[in-house]
Amino acid sequence: LDDRDYVEATTSGSTGIPKQIKLKKQSMVNSALATGDYLKLSPKNRALLCLPADFIAGKMMIIRSIILGLHLDIIRPSSMPLSLTSKNYDFCAMIPLQASKSLVDLPRVKKVILGGASIDGELEAKLQTISTEVYSSYGMTETISHIAMRKVNHTEVHQNTYKALPNVTFTQDERHCLVIDAPLIADHPVVTNDIV
């Protein structure tokens, strides 16, 4: 919390060599609002931060909590984060490994977004049997975390398709790679190396 209009972050390398970039604070606010609208999060909902805050996923959990008025509990990142708390939560972001090792406790969280890696078939099958609403997210540091989501469970038909968040559009470049246009989040289209 300083008077600069940006936050420095390091990219993961998904669009090239990892590098330091500046993310506009207003863009982070816009991303938080889009997630809140998409997941219907409300002020005073209880959220859990169980990811490192030096990466975009952890940073955005903090920003979402501030902007959306969520009550945020912060615990040490662990492969079994829910074993470190006995509370119930409305919202949490995890990586698939954390979810796979937390299946017994996951129903204590109403909504979970999974990112940072794809969800394998075995985990996807196990997630069908729990009460938690689980979403697979697609995004990167350059897009200030996720810009598309796919509902993993509680659907009538298996969903393979990610749905863009509001004000996000997708095109392809000449290599057939994904180009993300998210004007409320990024000043310029983000060209990925993901073939679509």
Which residues fall in each region the model found?
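AMP-binding/adenylate-forming
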Residues: 25-30, 46-101
